[in-house]
Curated annotation (Swiss-Prot):
Disulfide bonds: none annotated. One of its GO terms (molecular function) is methyltransferase activity. SUPFAM superfamilies: S-adenosyl-L-methionine-dependent methyltransferases (SSF53335). Keywords: Transferase, tRNA processing. It comes from the Bacteria. This is tRNA U34 carboxymethyltransferase. Carboxy-S-adenosyl-L-methionine binds at residues 88, 102, 107, 126, 176-177, 192, 196, 311. InterPro entries: CmoB, Mo5U34_MeTrfas-like, SAM-dependent_MTases_sf. GO terms for biological process: tRNA wobble uridine modification. It holds the Pfam family Methyltransf_9. Coiled coil: none annotated. The gene is cmoB. Homotetramer. The keyword tRNA processing applies. It comes from Azotobacter vinelandii (strain DJ / ATCC BAA-1303).
Amino acid sequence: MIDLSPLVRRLAGTPLAAWADSLPAELDERLTRSHGDLQRWKAALQALPALTAERIELNGRVSLSGTCHEETRAALRQALLGLSPWRKGPFELFGVLVDTEWRSDWKWQRVAPHLDLRGRRILDVGCGNGYYMWRMLGAGADCVIGIDPNWLFFCQFLALRHYLPELPAWHLPLALEDLPEKLEGFDTVFSMGVLYHRRSPIDHLLALKDCLRPGGELLLETLVVDGDVGTVLVPEDRYAQMRNVWFLPSVAALELWLRRAGFVEVRCVDVAVTSVEEQRATEWMTFQSLPDFLDPTDRGKTVEGLPAPTRAVLLARKP
């Protein structure tokens, strides 16, 4: 489904070369035991019409444009809808607006001013459908590798890559645990919206550090709560209807976790309450979303009576 030979060539002579050499066989093996819906998603990819991106914008937004007749645009729209639900975006593709559940561009506006990604080799952990990977290239990254074991997200990435085949971005259907230990080959590692799903958050931070070269930079974005260095919320059961949320620290506690994991120059650069305008149901994601997960009488609380989602962005460096 994806030719990794350009990635292997690009990483030759780097600390990631041996890992890259192993990836084609690993991807082939994973495809043999993939998701049951993969054939349906493959059919949607095969239905994508042949179009040429004459204008590509990845900096202010993710937008591809070029000659596209109405009949072709309708076929494109139908093929993309076949890859629903779309969580991260939005994307503008030849006149089709993929209005995703999340306004991920709003998060990127909070993150991007604090980073210089020019010439950086980047790993995006839990990359979803790759929206942020394209934005990283727009910010000048040398190459971006995203990992996420979700096969639908992988196919959504391939839909974009269908029209951007030459750009140095690769999505691998892997989890962080599938990577070799002590890779130490990335200049920048992103972990956004992942930490609170981890039963062992310190181990997650240590694994992220293992992926960075000495002096490399981590960008961590996760759910937080108000409080001091000793404050950590552990939901009794669900949080905003999610069962797989384990630890929501205060910013001060999260900074301590990063220092204990061996990071230096730890700093919080943004804290923002997630609004119902930023995360909501759309035609492209028709299931329940944030408005359904908040107390209808008090949007400062979830339906479980816990603090509503607030997200912090932290930067840290590996010594």
